[in-house]
Amino acid sequence: MHLLKGGVVLIITLILFLITSSIVAIREDPSLIGVDRQIPTGPDPLHNPPQPSPKHHHWIGVEENNIDRSWNYVDYESHHAHSPIHNSPEPAPLYRHLIGV
């Protein structure tokens, strides 16, 4: 009985040793299991994204300045400058007869 328990412990120990040593070897050289990893050279695109051209940046700025705001737009820099309840827009002339203006 003691011999059987010793054999089981020995087999489990050998299996754990083989697994851990193979994991260490694969981490050092992934090509052992057929993984050919190529490390890119040059600037890292995740941490150093290319900057937009000045022409493109200017076009975006012009587009942002010409945005038509909706009647319920809130300017978050000045909280009380625009109140959609008190400053509601006038109805279009086409629909004035529907509301009695």
From Swiss-Prot:
Residues 1-25 form the signal peptide. Keywords: Developmental protein, Differentiation, Glycoprotein, Hydroxylation, Secreted, Signal, Sulfation. GO terms for cellular component: apoplast. The gene is CLE18. Residues 37-58 are annotated as: Disordered. Glycans are attached at P43. GO terms for molecular function: receptor serine/threonine kinase binding. The modification Hydroxyproline is found at P40, P43, P84. The keyword Signal applies. This is CLAVATA3/ESR (CLE)-related protein 18. GO terms for biological process: cell-cell signaling involved in cell fate commitment; maintenance of root meristem identity; phloem development; regulation of asymmetric cell division; regulation of cell differentiation; regulation of lateral root development; regulation of root meristem growth; regulation of root morphogenesis. It comes from the Eukaryota. Residues 42-53 have a biased composition (Pro residues). The modification Sulfotyrosine is found at Y76. Belongs to the CLV3/ESR signal peptide family.
